[in-house]
UniProtKB/Swiss-Prot annotation:
The gene is rexB. Its cofactor is Mg(2+). Its EC number is 3.1.-.-. This is ATP-dependent helicase/deoxyribonuclease subunit B. Belongs to the helicase family. AddB/RexB type 2 subfamily. Despite having helicase-like domains, this subunit does not have helicase activity. It comes from Streptococcus agalactiae serotype III (strain NEM316). GO terms for molecular function: 5'-3' exonuclease activity; ATP binding; double-stranded DNA binding; helicase activity; hydrolase activity, acting on acid anhydrides. Pfam families: ADDB_N (PF21445), PDDEXK_1 (PF12705). The lineage of its organism: Bacteria, Bacillati, Bacillota, Bacilli, Lactobacillales. The keyword Translocase does not apply. Gene3D superfamilies: 3.90.320.10, P-loop containing nucleotide triphosphate hydrolases (3.40.50.300). It is an enzyme of class 3 (hydrolase). PANTHER family: RECBCD ENZYME SUBUNIT RECC. GO terms for biological process: double-strand break repair via homologous recombination. InterPro entries: ADDB_N, DNA_helicase_suRexB, P-loop_NTPase, PDDEXK-like_dom_sf, PDDEXK_AddAB-type, Restrct_endonuc-II-like.
C-alpha cells in the first residue's frame, strides 16, 4: 500500500499517471480507479497525461467495472437487476401482503416514492456491508418488522428468479478472499484517484486486494501543514487529511508528500493559502497581487437570465481570442434551476454544450402514451385521458383535422366511459357527420377496445397482447416518423428513451413473466417504471462546453471555469437524509455493529465535504475562474455564499454586472442570433439614457448588417405596438356575405353584439363562428324550455283551473322530443329539469287570468324595414292586449333585465324599442292600436333573505314584487297598469318620448349598417369607466389587453343619475334633427 498526497496547487492525476506509466513499463497490469461521477473526465485526463496518450497496460475504470472485469468468466453468474427491475421486485413483494400485515407501511404499498426509498435502502445496505437483520436497532420495532418482512419476500423472489442478490463488488470481494483470483491479481497494480472516503463495501474490497495485488496506490489532496496539524476540525483539507490518516492507520503505512511537475498559477496558490489560513486558525494571510486578482473574479448579476447571458458572452469572447469550447467548463449551484434558462441562452448564442447529468423521460411522448393508457384503464375512459392518448402523435394514423373534429364531438356529446366510446355515435346528427365520426372512432378505438378487455393472466401473455396492441396502433412507425425530422442530437435522445423502454419491457418479462396480473397492475408497473427512468447522453463531439454541478468538479479541470448560482442556498450544499433510516438510527446501528459494515452519515460529513468542494472549485480553473451570483434566484432574493464572502474579504475582485451594456467593441457582439435578440430587446425597451456617439455608430452599423441578413432570408424583425388595427374584409367576401341587391339583415341581438364589440359581430355574423355546443342543457336551453311552457299555458283556453293548465303545459313540454332527450340524459340534467319546473310554477303566478289583460299572440315573428336597406327580423315572445285595446310586448328572460336609457343610447339595449317599432308599424293592421309598453319578465323562483323579513305577510309581498314586468311604459296607459304587476317607477314615457326612442333606435341600426357594409370592423369592446373593459375582448384572438389597449375601447357616453333620463332624450332629439339635416 502506498499513500501519496500533494497540495491543491499541484496535480495529483499527473503524479498518479506517472506512477502508472512507470509500472506499465516494468510489465505490470494497471487498473486506474476513479469515482463514478468523474470516470469520463478522469479517463480523458489520464490519457492526456500519458506520454504516449494511450497504453494497453493501463485500464481506467470504476470499482464496479473492476469487479465485472475479474468476475466476468466466473461460474454461477446470476442475472443482475437495475433500479427499475428492483422497483418491480419490491412492487411484487408489497402486493403479496394482505391489508393489515404491514403495521407501519401498510398504506404505502402502492406508493411509487416509498418503493423508490426501499430500492435506495436495498442498495445502501449493500454498499454499507450490512444486512436487513442489522436494522434491529431501529427505534420502532414495528418499523423493523415491516422492513424485515418486505426484504425477506424480496430475497425469496430474487432467489426464485435466480437474480443476483448481492452487488458485483461484494461478489468480487468474496472471490478475492477465497483465493480464486490470486493468479490474476499477483501482476496487478491498483491506483485509486479522486476519493476522500470509501464506502464500507469499497473499503472491504481494498482490504482484500491489499494482500493479493502487487501494490495499491492511493492519492489525495492535502497540504503538509494540514497533515501535520494536531487539530483538523474545520480545516479546508480535513476531508483529505482524515482519509489519509485512517488509511495509514488501517494499512500501517506512512503517507508520502509528492509534487507534480505541473503547478498552478501563483495567484491560485496565494488564494488557496489565504483560505487555508482562515480555516486552520493560524490567520496567516497574503496580500493578493494583480496576478491573483486575475485568477478569480466574482460577478453579481441582477437575475439568472442576465447571469447566464454574461457568461455566454464571455464564452464567445474566449472563442474570439482563439480558445475552443472544450477549454471551458460551466458549473451550476442548482442544476434544476438553471438548466432551462442556460439551454435557451446557449442555443441563442450558438454555444454547443453537454449536460453531465442523467435526464428524466417524464416529458417524452412515449411516457405520455403510457401514462394516458394507464389512466384510461384506471379511470374508466375519461374523455381527457382518451384524447391525450390520441394527441401524443404516436397513436394510430389520423389527420389533425379528423382529430379536431373528433374532439369537438366528444366535447359536444359528452362521451365518457367505455360503453359510449365503443358504441356508434348517434347523437347530434344535425350538427355532425356521424358517418365520418364513427369511421374515425372505429379506426382509433378498435385496437384499444380489444386490449382493455385483457383478463387476469400470466404476465408474459399480457405483455404479448400489449406488443400486438402497439403494432396495431403503429407505435414504432409513428415514433420513427416523429423523430425522423429532428436534429441528430434529438434523434439520439429518442433512441435512448426507446432503449430504456425496451429494457423495461424485458425486465417485466423476466420478473413477472409467470406472475398472474390484471391489466391495471400491468400498466401501473410499466408506467411507474417509465416515470422513474432516466437516461444519459454521450456528447457527440469533444469540442463542447461541459456543464455540470459544481460539487462534482475536480481541481484543475479546465482552462476557464464559470460557476453560476453560487448563493448561500446552494454553496455550500447541505446534505439531508431523506431515507427510511434516520441519522440517529444509523449511528445506533454503527455503534452496535462490530463488523466492517457501517452506514454513512452524510449530515455529519457536510463540513468536511463542503470545505473540500469549495477548495476544489476555487482551483478548478487553470487560467481563470469566474464565480457568479444573482440578486434574484427563482424570483426570490438570496444571500451571498459565505465562501464568496471569504474571497471578497481577502481581496478577490467583486464586480457588479448590470444589464447588458451597449458596447461597441467587435468582440462584444457575440454572434448573429445573439445580436438579433439584443436588437429586438433594445427596440422593445425604453432606453433610459442617451447613447454615446461611439455606441450610436456601433448600433447603426450592427442594425444595417442585421437588416441585410434578414432581408436575404426573407425575415422581418417583429414590431410590437399598442395598435390593434384590423384589415378591411375583401369586397368579394362582403358581396357573398351581404349581397348588394338585398337589404342588410339585422336583429336586436345582432345590433347589441355590434355595439358590444364590432369585432365580435365580425366573428359571429361574418365568419359565422359559434360557441362550443353541448348536448347538456345550458342557459339557452333553459330559456327555451320556459318559453315553451308559457306558450302552451297561454294558448290553453279550456275550462280547467290555472294550476291544472300549468301542470298540463309542463307535462307536454317535458314529453316533447327535444326536451325529453335534453333533460333525461343524466342525474344532473334531471335535477336541472326539477329546478326549471319550480321556476315555471313560481313565474306563472303573474300569468293568471286578468280581466284587464288578454294574450293577443305568442311567438310572433316580424320583419321591420328601415329605408329599404335594412331588414330587422325577430320573434316577440308575447303580445298582450289591455281592456282599452292597447298592445304591449312581453319578452321572457332567464336573468334579471330592465330598460336602461343609458345603455339604450349607447346601442346596448335596443330590444324593447325595436319590438315597439315592430308592432306599431304592422302593415296588416289598418287601425293602429295604442302601445302601452314593452317589458321583460324575469322567469325565476324568488328567493328572500329571511333575516330581513319581519313577518310572513312581508314574505308574500316581496315575492310578488320580484315577479313584476319591468321595461318602458306609455304614460297615457298608466291607469290600466296600476294593478301591481308592472314596475312603473322611472319607467313611464310619453308618446313623444317613445317616438324619440324609436327614431334613435333606427339611427343606431343605420350607423351599424354603414360600418358593417364598409367591411372595417374595429376591435373596440366597450368600457363604462375607462378603467375596466366590460365588452367581450376575445383576448386569444385579438390580443386585446386592457392595460395596453384601453385607448382602443369604446367609452360609453354617461350622464349623472339625476340628469340621465332627460339628458339622453335631449341628446337623441338633437341627433335626430342633425340626421334630418
Amino acid at each position: 500500500m502506498k499513500l501519496l498526497y500533494t497540495d491543491i496547487n499541484h496535480d495529483m492525476t499527473e503524479i498518479l499517471v506517472n506512477q502508472a506509466a512507470h509500472a506499465a513499463e516494468a510489465g505490470w497490469r494497471i487498473f486506474y480507479i476513479a469515482p463514478n461521477s468523474l470516470s469520463f473526465e478522469k479517463e480523458r485526463a489520464v490519457l492526456e497525461n500519458l506520454p504516449q496518450e494511450a497504453s494497453f497496460a493501463i485500464t481506467i475504470t470504476r470499482f464496479a467495472q473492476l469487479a465485472r472485469y475479474f468476475t466476468l468468466n466466473q461460474p454461477n453468474q446470476k442475472e443482475s437487476l437495475n433500479d427499475i427491475g428492483l422497483a418491480m421486485i419490491f412492487y411484487r413483494a408489497l402486493a403479496s401482503f394482505e391489508d393489515g400485515q404491514l403495521k407501519v407501511f401498510g398504506r404505502l404499498k402502492q406508493d411509487a416514492s416509498f418503493i423508490s426509498q426501499l430500492v435506495d435502502l436495498y442498495k445502501e445496505l449493500q454498499t454499507a456491508n450490512l444486512s436487513i437483520l442489522d436494522l434491529k436497532y431501529l427505534h420502532s420495532p414495528e418499523k423493523f418488522e415491516d422492513l424485515l418482512a418486505i426484504f425477506l419476500v424480496v430475497s425469496d423472489l430474487l432467489r426464485e428468479g435466480e437474480y443476483d442478490n448481492q452487488s458485483k463488488i461484494a461478489f468480487f470481494t468474496e472471490q478475492v478472499r477465497s483465493g480464486q483470483l490470486d493468479v490474476d491479481l499477483k501482476n496487478t497494480i491498483l491506483i485509486v484517484d479522486g476519493f476522500t472516503r470509501f464506502s464500507a463495501e469499497e473499503e472491504a474490497l481494498i482490504k482484500s486486494l491489499s494482500s493479493r495485488c502487487q501494490e495499491i496506490i492511493i492519492g489525495a489532496y492535502a497540504s503538509q501543514k494540514a497533515y501535520k496539524a494536531n487539530f483538523t476540525n474545520g480545516n479546508i483539507y480535513s476531508a483529505g487529511v482524515d482519509f489519509l490518516r485512517y488509511l495509514a492507520t488501517t494499512f500501517q503505512t506512512k503517507p508520502e508528500f509528492i509534487l507534480s511537475k505541473w503547478e498552478s498559477k501563483s495567484g491560485f496558490e496565494m488564494i488557496s493559502k489565504n483560505i487555508e489560513g482562515k480555516h486552520d486558525f493560524t490567520n496567516s494571510s497574503h496580500i493578493l497581487d494583480d496576478t491573483a486578482k486575475d485568477c478569480i473574479t466574482i460577478w453579481e448579476c441582477i437575475n439568472q437570465k442576465d447571469e447566464v447571458e454574461h457568461v455566454a458572452r464571455a464564452i464567445r469572447q474566449k472563442l474570439y481570442q482563439g480558445y475552443r469550447y472544450k477549454d471551458i467548463l460551466v458549473l451550476l449551484g442548482d442544476v434544476d434551476s438553471y438548466k432551462l434558462q442556460l439551454s435557451k441562452i446557449f442555443e441563442q448564442y450558438d454555444i454547443p454544450y453537454y449536460f453531465g447529468k442523467a435526464e428524466t423521460m417524464a416529458a417524452h411522448p412515449l411516457v405520455h402514451f403510457m401514462d394516458s393508457l394507464s389512466r384510461i384503464k384506471r379511470y374508466r375512459f375519461r374523455a381527457e385521458d382518451v384524447l391525450n392518448l390520441f394527441k401524443t402523435g404516436i397513436y394510430g394514423e389520423i389527420s389533425q383535422d379528423d382529430l379536431d373534429y373528433f374532439e369537438a364531438y366528444i366535447s359536444y356529446a359528452d362521451i365518457k366511459g367505455p360503453k359510449k366510446f365503443f358504441t356508434d355515435f348517434v347523437v347530434g346528427a344535425k350538427k355532425f357527420d356521424l358517418g365520418r365520426l364513427n369511421t374515425i372512432r372505429q379506426s382509433l378505438l378498435a385496437p384499444l377496445e380489444s386490449f382493455v378487455k385483457t383478463k387476469k393472466q400470466d404476465g408474459i401473455k399480457t405483455l404479448n397482447q400489449f406488443m400486438f396492441f402497439l403494432t396495431q396502433v403503429g407505435l414504432s412507425d409513428n415514433l420513427s416518423r416523429l423523430v425522423g425530422q429532428m436534429s441528430e442530437n434529438e434523434q439520439e435522445k429518442h433512441q435512448e428513451v426507446w432503449k430504456t423502454f425496451t429494457d423495461i419491457l424485458e425486465q417485466f418479462q423476466t420478473i413477472f413473466g409467470q406472475e398472474k396480473l390484471n391489466l391495471d397492475e400491468f400498466l401501473s408497473l410499466l408506467n411507474s417504471g417509465m416515470m422513474q427512468a432516466e437516461y444519459r447522453m454521450v456528447p457527440a463531439t469533444v469540442d463542447v462546453v461541459t456543464v455540470k454541478s459544481y460539487d462534482l468538479v475536480e481541481p484543475h479541470s479546465n482552462q476557464f471555469v464559470y460557476a453560476l448560482g453560487m448563493t448561500q442556498s446552494h454553496f455550500p450544499k447541505i446534505a439531508q437524509n431523506k431515507s427510511l433510516i434516520s441519522d440517529i438510527e444509523r449511528q445506533l446501528i454503527n455503534d452496535a455493529n462490530d463488523t466492517d459494515g457501517h452506514f454513512d452519515i452524510m449530515t455529519r460529513e457536510n463540513l468536511k465535504k463542503n470545505h473540500f468542494a469549495a477548495l476544489s472549485l476555487f482551483n478548478a480553473a487553470k487560467q481563470a475562474l469566474v464565480l457568479t451570483i444573482p440578486q434574484l434566484l427563482n424570483e426570490s432574493e438570496d444571500q451571498m455564499s459565505p465562501y464568496l464572502i471569504e474571497l471578497r474579504d481577502i481581496g478577490v475582485p467583486f464586480n457588479h454586472k448590470g444589464r447588458q451594456s451597449l458596447k461597441e467593441e467587435a468582440d462584444n457582439i457575440g454572434n448573429y442570433k445573439a445580436l438579433l435578440s439584443r436588437v429586438v430587446d433594445l427596440y422593445r425597451s425604453a432606453i433610459d439614457k442617451e447613447m454615446t456617439k461611439e455606441e450610436q455608430t456601433f448600433w447603426s452599423v450592427a442594425v444595417r448588417y442585421l437588416r441585410r441578413q434578414l432581408t436575404s432570408k426573407g425575415i422581418e424583425i417583429p414590431i410590437i405596438t399598442d395598435s390593434l388595427d384590423t384589415v378591411t374584409v375583401s369586397s368579394d367576401v362582403m358581396t357573398r356575405r351581404f349581397p348588394e341587391d338585398d337589404p342588410l339583415k339585422l336583429s336586436s341581438s345582432a345590433l347589441t353584439t355590434f355595439y358590444n364589440n364590432q369585432y365580435k359581430y365580425f366573428l359571429q355574423y361574418v365568419l359565422g363562428l359559434e360557441e362550443q355546443d353541448s348536448i347538456h342543457p345550458d342557459m339557452r336551453h333553459h330559456g327555451t324550455y320556459l318559453h315553451r311552457v308559457f306558450e302552451i299555458l297561454m294558448k290553453n283556453q279550456g275550462i280547467e283551473s290555472f294550476e291544472e293548465k300549468l301542470n298540463s303545459a309542463i307535462n307536454k313540454t317535458n314529453q316533447e322530443d327535444v326536451f325529453k332527450s335534453l333533460y333525461s340524459e343524466d342525474a344532473e340534467s334531471r335535477y336541472s329539469l326539477e329546478i326549471l319546473e319550480d321556476i315555471a310554477r313560481a313565474t306563472a303566478t303573474i300569468l293568471r287570468q286578468d280581466s284587464q289583460m288578454t294574450v293577443e299572440s305568442e311567438e310572433e315573428r316580424f320583419e321591420l324595414m328601415i329605408d329599404n336597406t335594412i331588414k330587422i327580423n325577430g320573434i316577440i315572445d308575447r303580445i298582450d292586449r289591455l281592456s282599452d285595446g292597447s298592445l304591449g310586448v312581453v319578452d321572457y328572460k332567464s336573468s334579471a333585465q330592465k330598460f336602461d336609457i343609458q345603455k339604450f343610447y349607447n346601442g346596448l339595449s335596443p330590444q324593447l324599442v325595436t319590438y315597439i317599432d315592430a308592432i306599431s308599424r304592422d302593415k296588416e293592421v289598418e287601425q293602429k292600436p295604442p302601445i302601452f309598453g314593452a317589458m321583460y319578465l324575469h322567469m325565476q323562483e324568488p328567493k328572500q333573505d329571511l333575516s330581513k323579513i319581519k313577518n310572513l305577510d312581508d314574505l308574500v309581498t316581496k315575492n310578488h314584487q320580484a315577479l313584476t314586468y319591468k321595461g318602458l311604459f306609455s304614460e297615457a296607459e298608466k291607469e290600466f297598469l296600476a294593478n301591481g304587476k308592472y314596475h312603473l317607477k322611472d319607467s313611464l314615457y310619453s308618446e313623444a318620448e317613445i317616438a324619440i326612442l324609436q327614431a334613435h333606435n333606427q339611427l343606431l341600426y343605420k350607423k351599424a349598417s354603414e360600418t358593417i357594409k364598409s367591411g372595417k370592423f374595429l376591435i373596440n369592446p366597450y368600457t363604462e369607466d375607462a378603467k375596466t373593459v366590460d365588452g367581450d375582448q376575445f383576448k386569444s384572438i385579438t390580443g386585446f389587453e386592457a392595460d395596453r389597449h384601453m385607448a382602443r375601447a369604446r367609452a360609453l357616453y354617461k350622464l349623472p343619475a339625476k340628469e340621465k333620463r332627460q339628458g339622453f332624450l335631449t341628446l337623441m332629439q338633437q341627433e335626430e334633427e342633425n340626421d334630418d339635416l
